[in-house]
């Protein structure tokens, strides 16, 4: 083994296996691009993003950690969300939850 080397199992690694997902259409109604990171609580995203927020409570983008999705002004796109796991407590972001989901 080389110091710092990462050894992984062979084959594909399935992200978020067994978790509930949701595909939802999102439109940027603002005049500036909006970027949402992989672990941001989607329910609390920028108010210029138009979508059914109630359906997204407790969910985040179903993309690899560290990635993001960018919504250009006037753009609509469908994204896939995945439920948070673990204790399901959300703190920070825009302060709309600040506790258990």
Curated annotation (Swiss-Prot):
Known EC number: 3.5.1.5
Keyword Hydrolase in record: yes
One annotated Gene Ontology cellular component of this protein: urease complex
Keywords of the record: Cytoplasm, Hydrolase
GO molecular function: urease activity
Reactions the enzyme catalyzes: urea + 2 H2O + H(+) = hydrogencarbonate + 2 NH4(+)
Compartment list: Cytoplasm
Pathway: Nitrogen metabolism; urea degradation; CO(2) and NH(3) from urea (urease route): step 1/1
SUPFAM superfamilies linked to this entry: Urease, beta-subunit
One Pfam family cited in the UniProt record for this chain: Urease_beta
Keyword Transcription regulation attached: no
GO biological process: urea catabolic process
InterPro entries registered for this protein in UniProt: Urease_beta-like (IPR002019), Urease_betasu_sf (IPR036461), Urease_subunit (IPR050069)
Stated family: Belongs to the urease beta subunit family.
Database matches in HAMAP family: Urease_beta
PANTHER family for the chain: UREASE
Subunit-level organization: Heterotrimer of UreA (gamma), UreB (beta) and UreC (alpha) subunits. Three heterotrimers associate to form the active enzyme.
Protein name: Urease subunit beta
Species this protein is from: Nitrosococcus oceani (strain ATCC 19707 / BCRC 17464 / JCM 30415 / NCIMB 11848 / C-107)
């Amino acid at each position: 083994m080389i110091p710092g080397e990462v050894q992984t199992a062979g084959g594909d690694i399935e992200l978020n296996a067994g978790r509930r997902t949701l595909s939802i259409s999102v439109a940027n109604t603002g005049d500036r691009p909006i970027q949402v990171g992989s672990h941001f609580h989607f329910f609390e995203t920028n108010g210029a993003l138009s979508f059914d927020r109630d359906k997204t409570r407790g969910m985040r983008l179903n993309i690899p950690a560290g990635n993001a999705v960018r919504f250009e002004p006037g753009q609509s796109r469908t994204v896939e969300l995945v439920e948070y796991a673990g204790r399901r407590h959300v703190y920070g972001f825009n302060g709309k939850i600040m506790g258990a989901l």
